[in-house]
């Protein structure tokens, strides 16, 4: 690993830590030439996944788009960044275990939905209201009743 300060290749790892979800490794490094310290983050490279949209279009899977939708659903909720990252990692791990290279958007939505239901019910309702394209208050009331009954189907 080259030093970002002096471009020397003479660096060594001082400390390594696995993330909570074991999907990445954070390494603290020291440059032997200029004595600068810097941190690197090693993450699992996902296989290329295509998303099949409702209208039949295909687009490459965008991890940032998924993270943004989860962040919007959990906005101003008592959910930490660590919890959000854990949910994201679970979802990405699930994608890695799928044999297909094309995943329907519907399947992605269901996986996110199920993870948010466990994490925070309000975030779940927010996500589902967009995902299911709710049109009026009755849709919300119906979903809340299903959650109270313990069934989200």
Swiss-Prot record:
Domain ATP-cone: 49-139
Region (Disordered): 1-20
GO molecular function (one): zinc ion binding
Example of a GO biological process term: negative regulation of DNA-templated transcription
InterPro entries according to UniProt: ATP-cone_dom (IPR005144), NrdR-like_N (IPR055173), RNR_NrdR-like (IPR003796)
Biased composition (Basic and acidic residues): 11-20
HAMAP family, alphabetized: NrdR
Functional summary from the UniProt entry: Negatively regulates transcription of bacterial ribonucleotide reductase nrd genes and operons by binding to NrdR-boxes.
Protein name (Swiss-Prot/TrEMBL): Transcriptional repressor NrdR
Species assigned in the record: Anaplasma phagocytophilum (strain HZ)
């Amino acid at each position: 690993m080259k030093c970002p300060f002096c471009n020397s290749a003479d660096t060594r790892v001082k400390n390594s830590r696995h993330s909570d979800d074991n999907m990445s490794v954070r390494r603290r490094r020291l440059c032997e030439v200029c004595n600068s310290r810097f941190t690197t983050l090693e993450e699992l490279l996902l296989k290329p996944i295509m998303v099949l949209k409702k209208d039949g279009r295909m687009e490459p899977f965008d991890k940032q788009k998924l993270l943004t939708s989860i962040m919007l659903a959990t906005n101003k909720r008592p959910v930490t960044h660590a919890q959000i990252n854990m949910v994201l990692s679970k979802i990405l791990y699930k994608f890695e275990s799928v044999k297909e290279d094309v995943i329907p958007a519907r399947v992605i939505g269901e996986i996110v939905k199920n993870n948010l239901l466990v994490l925070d019910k309000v975030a779940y309702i927010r996500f589902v209201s967009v995902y299911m394209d709710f049109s009026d208050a009755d849709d919300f009331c119906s979903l809340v009743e299903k959650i109270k009954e313990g069934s989200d189907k």
